[in-house]
Swiss-Prot record:
SUPFAM superfamilies documented for this protein: (Phosphotyrosine protein) phosphatases II, FYVE/PHD zinc finger, PH domain-like
Active site, per annotation: 407 (phosphocysteine intermediate)
GO cellular component: early endosome membrane; early phagosome membrane; endosome membrane; late endosome membrane; recycling endosome membrane
Oligomeric and partner information: Homooligomeric. Forms MTMR3:MTMR4 heterooligomers; regulates the localization of both proteins. The MTMR3:MTMR4 heterooligomer can also recruit both CEP55 and PLK1; occurs during early mitosis, regulates the phosphorylation of CEP55 by PLK1 and its recruitment to the midbody where it can mediate cell abscission. Interacts with SMAD2 and SMAD3; negatively regulates TGF-beta signaling through SMAD2 and SMAD3 dephosphorylation and retention in endosomes. Interacts with SMAD1; negatively regulates BMP signaling through SMAD1 dephosphorylation and retention in endosomes.
Biased composition (Polar residues): 618-637, 782-847
Cited CDD domains: FYVE_MTMR4, PH-GRAM_MTMR4, PTP-MTMR4
Role noted for this protein: Decreases the levels of phosphatidylinositol 3-phosphate, a phospholipid found in cell membranes where it acts as key regulator of both cell signaling and intracellular membrane traffic, in a subset of endosomal membranes to negatively regulate both endocytic recycling and trafficking and/or maturation of endosomes toward lysosomes.
Short sequence motif named PY-motif, residue ranges: 999-1003
Family of this protein: Belongs to the protein-tyrosine phosphatase family. Non-receptor class myotubularin subfamily.
Pfam hit, one: FYVE
Gene Ontology biological process terms, A to Z: midbody abscission; negative regulation of endocytic recycling; phagosome maturation; phosphatidylinositol dephosphorylation; response to denervation involved in regulation of muscle adaptation
Record protein name field: Phosphatidylinositol-3,5-bisphosphate 3-phosphatase MTMR4
InterPro entries assigned: MTMR4_FYVE, MTMR4_PH-GRAM, MTMR4_PTP, Myotubularin, Myotubularin-like_Pase_dom, Prot-tyrosine_phosphatase-like, Tyr_Pase_AS, Tyr_Pase_dom
Length: 1190
C-alpha cells in the first residue's frame, strides 16, 4: 500500500454553515463600536449625521453622541424614509428610532440595507439563533457549559413534576393520555394530555373532530386546597346548523365530576363532601374506566357547577358561527354555566398597540398625553384581561368550582387568562423557576403562534397575523408586580429581558408556532435557550423584596386608574440610562473627531452664558450640553487642566458633564453609565451608612523603596492627596474614624500603624498660596461618589499649575514634556444648587505622585519617602493601583452594586518617573463576547489623559460598579481627593500619552444588550452587599481571634519553669560569651515571654480537606446551583466547591507543598496575593533599619 494521503472527507464544523459576510465600510478609518457575539458579523458600517451606524446579522447599532441605540434586527417592525433625509424605524416593543443622514442618496441606501436585513426569513436557518448556537459549539468545553446550558431539569421534566406538585390522583380519578404522541391528534397540543380516567381515547378522537383545530378540553391546573381544576380548549364547531357532540358534552361534565372525586386538602375533611365515606371508598377501590356510571360516583358529593369562560363577547361568539365556530349552549351542557368576558381579538389589540407606539414616539412632553394614552385603549384591554383572570381565580379559590376557558382558537386569549389565573392562585408560578415552567407549559406547549404573532415565521407575509399577545400578557404580569412587589421572586428587569428576546431571535425558545414544528426542525438542539440567560441563579433578576413561603392568593385592583404604563418598555428614554455606553469619538479618526465636534446636533439646549439659569434649563425636556462656543468658556479654554476629582451625581433633570479630552465633546452621566441620580434628600439619607469594600484587589507585585519629593507652585489653591491602604480589615468603628481623618484633622488609631505597617496616612502639600483643607467627604452608597457640600453651588475655574521638576516630580522629564503639544479641553458647566460640583478637566498622567508612604505623623508635610509597586506586566505602580482580573459572571451577578465589592474594583495605574512611554494597560473587552469564565480587566480611573478617561473613567466596569474609586489590599477605599479653593482648581501640565486601540464597551449580559436599571433594586443590592460585607468582616475577625488564641496557646511559656531549666539558659548565655546583660535580670523575663517563641503555623502540619462533591449542591461563592452544565471545581487552598466562574485562577501554594500553579478560588487567590505583598512589604521596611544599624 502506498503512503496515506489526506482524508477524502473534510471535517466541517457547525459554524462553517454560517460563514461571516464581508464588512462594507463607508470610511476606512471607522471601527465597529460594539462587541460582537459569537457568530455575529458586522455587514455594513457607516456614518449618519452626528452618529455611527452599523448593521450586523443580529442587530442595528446607532451610536449618537449622547446615547446608543442597540436593537436586534428581528425587533424592528417597519422601516421607512421620511423628510428625505430621515430613517423612521418602528420596533415591535413600541420604540421608535430616528436617524438622520446628510444626503438623500445615503438615506435611501441605508433604507435598502435595513429593509433587506429585516425582511421575513426564507428559511429557519436565516434566523440568528442558529448561527449563534453553531459558532458557540466551537468553543472549549468549559465555555459551552457556561454559555450553552439548556433549560434546567425543572423545564425538561416539567409535566411530570407539575402533576406530582399539584397532587393529581392518577390512579383513580385522572389519567395521562398518550393519544397525541408524535402530535398525530393535534400539532399545537403537547403529547401528553390530562383527562378524567374514564374518558377513552376513542371518545377523545370524537371530541377533537368537534373542537376547532382539534384542541380538546384538557386539564392544566388543580387547586391543592379544594381540588377545583382549570381546563382549556378551543371553541366548538356548532356553525349555523347547531351541531352537537355527545362525547364533547360528556367530557366537559366529566371534568366537574372528577374534581368532586379528587377533593383537595381542605375538602378532604368533609367540608365539601356530603356522601358517605363507605361509598367513596368503594368507588376508589372498584373504579374502572368502563364504569362511567358506578354507584360510587353518584353517591358522592354533587359536582360543583362548571364555569365555561368564553373570552370573547357574546356577539363575536355568535358571529363565529358563520365561519363554523360558535359557543356552548347551557341547555346542552348540564351543570355548566357560560360566561362571556368581551376581550378584544388580535386585530383590535394590534391596532391599540400601534396607537400606543405612535403616542409614545411623540415629543417628550405633549399637552394631551393622558387623553392620547386613553385613546389607545391599551390600559383598558389590560384591565379586561386582569378581570377575566381574577374571575377564574375567585371561582376556583373561593367557590371551589372548576373552570373551562376558551376563545376562538385557544392559543391567544386563552393562555393569557389561564396563565394569569395560575399566577394569582399559585405562589409557585411567582418564582423564577415556576414562571419559566408556566411560560413553557401554557404558552409554548399549548401552541401559541409565536412565529406568526412576533413576525419571524418564514414565508409568512400576512401582517394581520402579527399581534403583541405575549407582550400584553407580560404587561399584565408587570401590573401585578407593581401591586404586589413582595410576592414575586423576579423583578422588572426579568420581564424586560423576556420582552426583548421574544422578538430578538437570539434564542430558540420562541421560534416556530407550535411544539410540533420545533421538534421537526430540531430547534431545541440547534439553538440556545433563553432560560440560560434568565436562570434562577442570576441575581440580576432576583427581587430583593421577595418574601418566600407566602401562599397568598392575589386579588389585584383591575380598574384602569390603578394600572400603570410600562415605561421601561414603552418609554425607555424616560427610564434611567443604561450601562455600557461610551463616547462615539473613541471609534473615529482624529479628523473625524474634529468634524463631529464642530457639527453638533441642532436640537440641543440653546447655549447660555455659563449656564447661569441652570435650574430652569433642567426643567426643560431637551438634554443639557456644553460646548466651547459659549463666550464665557473660550476665554479659559486654553487654561483648563485636569485633576482627579471624581464624578458627582446631579439632581433629577440635570446632567453632569465630563470632558473627554482633545477634540471630543463632553460626556453626560448617562453616557458614562453612571447610576441614575437621586434627589439630595435621598442622598443624605443613603449616605449615613456608606459601604466599604472588604476584599483585596491586587496582583503579584514587588515593593520598591523610593524617595520622591513633589511640590506644586500656584497662586490659588492648596492641593492635598489622601491615600489610604490597609492589609487587614480593621474594626468598623475605627475604620469610619480613620476615613474621617485627613492631614491634621485627626490621627489614625495607633494599632493600624503598628500592627502591619501597611496602613498609612499622608498628605502632599503644594505651595499654591492659601490653604483649604477639607476632610474626606462621605461616600454616597448609591452612586459610589463622595458628597461634597462645601462645593455646592459654585463655579470652578481651573488655572495652570506648573510642577517643580527640581524637587523630583514623577512627571516625564522636561525635555519630553516640551516636545508634546498641549491639548485643549473644555470647561464644565456650573452645577445647580443642591447638587455636587462637576469639574471638567484632563487627567494628569504623571503629575500626581501615586505613592504609598511609610508610617509617619499625619500632620507632617514636605517631601515623603514613599514606596511603589512593581508589576511584572505594568512596571512600577503604587500598591493600590495594581489591577485584578474579574470574571464576567461576577459582573453579571452583581452588576449594580454601589458598594466597594472586589468584583467591580478596577485598580488605577500610573507610571513612574523616567518612563517616557507608558506601558499599555490590559483591555477589559475582547473581540468575541464571552460568558462568565472569560477574564476581563476592570479599568479604574487611571492617570492617563484622554485614554484614561475613555478606558478607565468611562468604562462600564468602573463607572457603574467601582464608582470611580479603587480598593486597596485591605478593602479600604484608596481615593485621592483634591481639596480646592472655592474659586479655582490648579493642576500641572499634562504629558501626552499614546492612545492604544479602542476597546469596545463591556455589556453586562451575554445577549449583547444593556441591562435595564432599577433604582429600588439597586439600593436593595447595596443593602445585601453591606450585610454580606459585615458577615465576611465578622468571619475574618473570628478567624483572626482564633489564630491569636492558637498562637498564644502554642507559644505560652510554662507557668513555673524549673530552676535547672533556667540554669541551662544561663549557662548557654555564658558559654556564648555574652556579658551584655544577666539572664537572671528583669530583662531576662522578656526572653521567656511569648515574643521569644517562634510561632508555629498550623497549616504546615495540616492538609486541606476537600468538601465531598455530594455535599455541595451550590457554589460556595455565588450560590449558583450545580447541574450537568455547571460543574464543580475544588479550590486547592480552602477545599470548598465552586463553579467555573468563581474558581478559574491558578497559583502555586507552597504551604500545601504545591509548587506548580493549581486551581484556587477568587477569595484564596486574593488572600495569597495579599499575604505575599505583606511579606515583601515587611522585608523592604526592614532594609532601611538594617542599613542604618550597620
Amino acid at each position: 500500500m502506498g503512503e496515506e494521503g489526506p482524508p477524502s472527507l473534510e471535517y466541517i464544523q457547525a459554524k462553517d454553515l454560517f460563514p461571516p459576510k464581508e464588512l462594507v465600510k463607508e470610511e476606512e478609518n471607522l471601527q465597529v463600536p460594539f462587541t460582537v457575539l459569537q457568530g455575529e458579523g458586522v455587514e455594513f458600517l457607516g456614518r449618519a449625521t452626528d452618529a455611527l451606524i452599523a448593521i450586523s446579522n443580529y442587530r442595528l447599532h446607532i451610536k449618537f453622541k449622547d446615547s446608543v441605540i442597540n436593537v436586534p434586527l428581528r425587533m424592528i417592525d417597519s422601516v421607512e424614509s421620511r423628510d428625505m433625509f430621515q430613517l423612521h424605524i418602528a420596533c415591535k416593543d413600541s420604540k421608535v428610532v430616528r436617524c438622520h443622514f446628510s444626503t438623500f442618496k445615503q438615506c435611501q441606501e441605508w433604507l435598502s440595507r435595513l429593509s433587506r436585513a429585516t425582511a421575513r426569513p426564507a428559511k429557519p436557518e436565516d434566523l440568528f439563533a442558529f448561527a449563534y448556537h453553531a459558532w458557540c459549539l466551537g468553543l472549549t468545553e468549559e465555555d459551552q457549559h457556561t454559555h450553552l446550558c439548556q433549560p434546567g431539569e425543572h423545564i425538561r421534566c416539567r409535566q411530570e413534576a407539575e402533576l406530582a406538585r399539584m397532587g393529581f390522583d392518577l390512579q383513580n380519578v385522572w389519567r395521562v393520555s398518550h393519544i397525541n404522541s408524535n402530535y398525530k391528534l393535534c400539532p399545537s397540543y403537547p403529547q401528553k394530555l390530562l383527562v378524567p380516567v374514564w374518558i377513552t381515547d376513542k371518545e377523545l378522537e370524537n371530541v377533537a373532530s368537534f373542537r376547532s383545530w382539534k384542541r380538546i378540553p384538557v386539564v392544566v391546573y388543580r387547586h391543592l386546597r379544594n381540588g377545583a381544576a382549570i381546563a382549556r380548549c378551543s371553541q366548538p364547531e356548532i356553525s349555523w346548523w347547531g351541531w352537537r357532540n355527545a362525547d364533547d358534552e360528556y367530557l366537559v361534565t366529566s371534568i366537574a365530576k372528577a374534581c368532586a372525586l379528587d377533593p383537595g386538602t381542605r375538602a378532604s375533611g368533609g367540608s365539601l363532601s356530603t356522601g358517605t365515606n363507605d361509598a367513596s371508598e368503594a368507588c376508589d377501590t372498584d373504579f374502572d374506566s368502563s364504569l362511567t356510571a358506578c354507584s360510587g360516583v353518584e353517591s358522592t358529593a354533587a359536582p360543583q357547577k362548571l364555569l365555561i369562560l368564553d373570552a370573547r363577547s357574546y356577539t363575536a361568539a355568535v358571529a363565529n358561527r358563520a365561519k363554523g365556530g360558535g359557543c356552548e349552549c347551557e341547555e346542552y351542557y348540564p351543570n355548566c354555566e357560560v360566561l362571556f368576558m368581551g376581550m378584544a381579538n388580535i386585530h383590535a389589540i394590534r391596532n391599540s398597540f400601534q396607537y400606543l407606539r405612535a403616542v409614545c414616539s411623540q415629543m417628550p412632553d405633549p399637552s394631551n398625553w393622558l387623553s392620547a394614552l386613553e385613546s389607545t385603549k391599551w390600559l383598558q384591554h389590560l384591565s379586561v384581561m386582569l378581570k377575566a383572570a381574577v374571575l377564574v381565580a375567585n371561582t376556583v379559590d373561593r367557590e371551589g368550582r372548576p373552570v373551562l376557558v376558551h376563545c376562538s382558537d385557544g392559543w391567544d386569549r386563552t393562555p393569557q387568562i389561564v396563565a394569569l389565573a395560575k399566577i394569582l392562585l399559585d405562589p409557585y408560578y411567582r418564582t423564577l423557576e415556576g414562571f419559566q415552567v408556566l411560560v413553557e407549559s401554557d404558552w409554548l406547549d399549548f401552541g401559541h403562534k409565536f412565529g406568526d404573532r412576533c413576525g419571524h415565521q418564514e414565508n409568512a407575509e400576512d401582517q394581520n397575523e402579527q399581534c403583541p399577545v405575549f407582550l400584553q400578557w407580560l404587561d399584565s404580569v408587570h401590573q401585578l408586580l407593581k401591586q404586589f412587589p413582595c410576592l414575586f421572586e423576579f423583578n422588572e428587569a426579568f420581564l424586560v429581558k423576556l420582552v426583548q428576546h421574544t422578538y430578538s431571535c437570539l434564542y430558540g425558545t420562541f421560534l416556530a408556532n407550535n411544539p410540533c414544528e420545533r421538534e421537526k426542525r430540531n430547534i431545541y438542539k440547534r439553538t440556545c435557550s433563553v432560560w440560560a440567560l434568565l436562570r434562577a441563579g442570576n441575581k440580576n433578576f432576583h427581587n430583593f423584596l421577595y418574601t418566600p413561603g407566602s401562599d397568598v392568593v392575589l386579588h389585584p385592583v383591575c380598574h384602569v386608574r390603578a394600572l400603570h404604563l410600562w415605561t421601561a418598555v414603552y418609554l425607555p428614554a424616560s427610564s434611567p440610562c443604561t450601562l455600557g455606553e461610551e463616547n462615539m469619538d473613541l471609534y473615529l479618526s482624529p479628523v473625524a473627531q474634529s468634524q463631529e465636534f464642530s457639527g453638533r446636533s441642532l436640537d440641543r439646549l440653546p447655549k447660555t452664558r455659563s449656564m447661569d439659569d441652570l435650574l430652569s434649563a433642567c426643567d426643560t425636556s431637551s438634554p443639557l450640553t456644553r460646548t466651547s462656543s459659549d463666550p464665557n468658556l473660550n476665554n479659559h479654554s486654553q487654561e483648563v487642566r485636569g485633576s482627579l476629582e471624581p464624578w458627582h451625581s446631579s439632581p433629577e433633570g440635570a446632567e453632569t458633564v465630563i470632558d473627554s479630552g482633545v477634540g471630543s465633546p463632553q460626556l453626560t452621566v448617562g453616557e458614562m453609565g453612571l447610576p441614575p441620580p437621586l434627589p439630595s434628600s435621598q442622598k443624605e439619607y443613603l449616605s449615613n451608612k456608606p459601604f466599604k469594600g472588604h476584599k483585596s484587589c491586587s496582583l503579584s507585585y514587588k515593593l520598591l523603596n523610593t524617595s520622591v519629593s513633589w511640590e506644586m507652585k500656584s497662586n490659588t489653591s492648596d492641593i492635598k492627596v489622601l491615600e489610604e491602604t490597609e492589609a487587614l480589615a480593621p474594626d468598623p468603628s475605627a475604620q469610619e474614624e480613620q476615613g474621617r481623618t485627613s492631614d491634621g484633622l485627626g490621627k489614625p488609631p495607633e494599632q493600624f500603624l503598628e500592627k502591619e505597617a501597611v496602613s498609612s496616612l499622608c498628605s502632599v502639600s503644594s505651595k499654591c498660596g492659601g490653604a483649604c483643607d477639607f476632610p474626606e467627604p462621605p461616600q454616597d452608597p448609591l452612586t459610589g461618589t463622595p458628597q461634597q457640600p462645601h462645593l455646592d453651588s459654585m463655579q470652578i475655574s481651573p488655572s495652570r499649575c506648573t510642577p517643580d521638576h527640581s524637587q523630583g516630580s514623577l512627571c516625564n522629564p522636561p525635555s519630553v514634556a516640551s516636545q508634546t503639544p498641549e491639548p485643549n479641553t473644555d470647561l464644565l458647566s456650573q452645577d445647580p444648587p443642591g447638587s455636587t460640583a462637576s469639574i471638567s478637566h484632563q487627567e494628569q498622567p504623571s503629575s500626581v505622585p501615586d505613592l504609598i508612604y511609610k508610617k509617619e505623623d499625619a500632620g507632617k508635610r514636605g517631601s515623603k519617602n514613599g514606596q511603589l509597586l512593581e508589576n511584572p506586566r505594568f512596571g512600577k505602580m503604587p500598591l493600590e493601583l495594581a489591577r485584578k482580573p474579574i470574571s464576567q459572571s461576577q459582573i453579571s451577578e452583581f452588576s449594580f452594586l454601589g458598594s466597594n465589592w472586589d468584583s467591580f474594583q478596577g485598580m488605577m495605574t500610573s507610571f513612574p518617573s523616567g518612563e517616557t512611554t507608558p506601558r499599555r494597560l490590559l483591555a477589559y473587552g475582547c473581540c468575541s463576547k464571552r460568558p462568565s469564565n472569560k477574564h476581563i480587566r476592570a479599568a479604574g480611573p487611571c492617570l492617563g489623559g484622554q485614554w484614561a478617561q475613555r478606558e478607565g473613567m468611562k468604562s462600564p466596569v468602573c463607572s457603574s460598579h467601582s464608582n470611580g474609586h479603587c480598593t486597596g489590599p485591605g478593602g479600604k477605599n484608596n481615593r485621592m481627593w483634591f481639596s480646592s479653593h472655592p474659586k479655582q482648581v490648579s493642576s500641572t501640565k499634562p504629558s501626552l500619552l499614546s492612545c492604544p486601540s479602542p476597546v469596545p464597551p463591556l455589556y453586562l449580559d451575554d445577549d449583547g444588550l444593556p441591562f435595564p436599571t432599577d433604582v429600588i433594586q439597586h439600593r436593595l443590592r447595596q443593602i445585601e452587599a453591606g450585610y454580606r460585607q459585615e458577615v465576611e468582616q465578622l468571619r475574618r475577625q473570628v478567624r483572626e481571634l482564633q489564630m491569636r488564641l492558637d498562637i498564644r496557646h502554642c507559644c505560652a511559656p510554662p507557668a513555673e519553669p524549673p530552676m535547672d531549666y533556667e540554669d541551662d539558659f544561663t549557662c548557654l548565655k555564658e558559654s556564648d560569651g555574652s556579658d551584655t546583660e544577666d539572664f537572671g535580670s528583669d530583662h531576662s523575663e522578656d526572653c521567656l515571654s511569648e515574643a521569644s517563641w517562634e510561632p508555629v503555623d498550623k497549616k504546615e502540619t495540616e492538609v486541606t480537606r476537600w468538601v465531598p462533591d455530594h455535599m455541595a449542591s451550590h457554589c460556595f461563592n455565588c450560590d449558583c446551583e450545580f447541574w450537568l452544565a455547571k460543574r464543580r471545581h475544588h479550590c486547592r487552598n480552602c477545599g470548598n466547591v465552586f463553579c467555573a466562574g468563581c474558581c478559574h485562577l491558578k497559583l502555586p501554594i507552597p504551604d500545601q507543598q504545591l509548587y506548580d500553579p493549581v486551581l484556587v478560588c477568587n477569595s484564596c487567590y486574593e488572600h495569597i496575593q495579599v499575604s505575599r505583598a505583606r511579606e515583601l512589604m515587611s522585608q523592604h521596611l526592614k532594609k532601611p533599619i538594617a542599613t542604618a544599624s550597620s
